Amino acid sequence: MEKYILSIDQGTTSSRAILFNQKGEIAGVAQREFKQYFPQSGWVEHDANEIWTSVLAVMTEVINENDVRADQIAGIGITNQRETTVVWDKHTGRPIYHAIVWQSRQTQSICSELKQQGYEQTFRDKTGLLLDPYFAGTKVKWILDNVEGAREKAENGDLLFGTIDTWLVWKLSGKAAHITDYSNASRTLMFNIHDLEWDDELLELLTVPKNMLPEVKPSSEVYGKTIDYHFYGQEVPIAGVAGDQQAALFGQACFERGDVKNTYGTGGFMLMNTGDKAVKSESGLLTTIAYGIDGKVNYALEGSIFVSGSAIQWLRDGLRMINSAPQSESYATRVDSTEGVYVVPAFVGLGTPYWDSEARGAIFGLSRGTEKEHFIRATLESLCYQTRDVMEAMSKDSGIDVQSLRVDGGAVKNNFIMQFQADIVNTSVERPEIQETTALGAAFLAGLAVGFWESKDDIAKNWKLEEKFDPKMDEGEREKLYRGWKKAVEATQVFKTE
């Protein structure tokens, strides 16, 4: 009887369930979208119960549609949109407010106040993060401050906090397990990544009672089992948890110090495994936990690119220059260069290493001879220049020269982007056969905990290369192009509308 690992990939706009076999191959997929709520400008919320319903639906669908019995599921792995925050009543199981999503800016004033009080470096030193609304801690404080009676309930021990992984494990286990893993805890602004414990000083600054917080566990461990009615009477081990970007790092088998993966999604995320050392960044990177396994944690450096694949969506939906994302490749390859055109897609500011929230998108180098093909090519090239910006910051902070770049996300299907990426970073780019690396990482973590796979070496054998892109551009051309990009970014930062 063939066994499978069921991976739950709970994302920002949809929930997915994916079955993986022992070779790490996909045996079935189900997906369901859920509603986004925007109560005010800059606020983004989800209904945690709707997320739970969507997860139940896709788990049921993937099992039924692929004729898999519940007793064929060896374990469940969970990967989740990071930082999104749920607070719920531990007696009724009902959330007391919507889940506040990672993108939501409704806690900006809390962050500004803490910065004015001089606490930014305290948070940076202990958590490796920036004092920003992106992270979970200020979201918890906002809920306790703004929902009537919440603070009193929290102090009486009646409320629980969790990121989405915690919420799903609690529900799946029938309220038995209130846990998170090291990778998700490291995104809360409340967890000391050096001591590996919730930090009393930070909790006091955020006025969050410690009794609300989940127990922090390794990323690969049996946390509990499903209760009867979810799996037709089967008690299936819930055995692996990691935040989405860390799960992708694990799914790419980036197990060694210096291994790097880059995800080209709506935005871009690059993570470097820095081994057992938390590398302090001087270049605007985040220091975070990659995963905890085998009794120790691996740390990572993380760089964020705000606009990656969404630049291609902009070409399609905003400018109507292309009818589909794949069409961008054929247009880009009709010309040999951009003829000096640069697109800086700072639609919502610039991420690592600039962290300039006021910058806005800009185009440079236009001439009467500029055609649609040049413009499209320049937009695709911008993804690669931004990736080099982050990679250079990583090499500077870590002292490690990146030997190869493993890639995933929607834009990796574009061969032009992959080749230009290799050229502009002067490093081989490796595209895997299975590009569902986030879900695969969660499956690997769960599979290790239940003996489905024996070791990380066993897992590494399952990682298969689809295509390798080696750099072909000569150094003079590469550096000339990159100098042009840096000038374009500099000019973008100078021009600010009032």
Curated annotation (Swiss-Prot):
Top enzyme category: transferase
Entry protein name: Glycerol kinase
Gene source species: Staphylococcus aureus (strain MW2)
Pathway the protein takes part in: Polyol metabolism; glycerol degradation via glycerol kinase pathway; sn-glycerol 3-phosphate from glycerol: step 1/1
Transmembrane segments: none
Activity regulation comment: Activated by phosphorylation and inhibited by fructose 1,6-bisphosphate (FBP).
Entry GO terms, CC: cytosol
Catalyzed chemical reaction(s): glycerol + ATP = sn-glycerol 3-phosphate + ADP + H(+)
Record-listed ATP binding positions: T12, T13, S14, T266, G309, Q313, G410
Record carries keyword Acyltransferase: no
Family: Belongs to the FGGY kinase family.
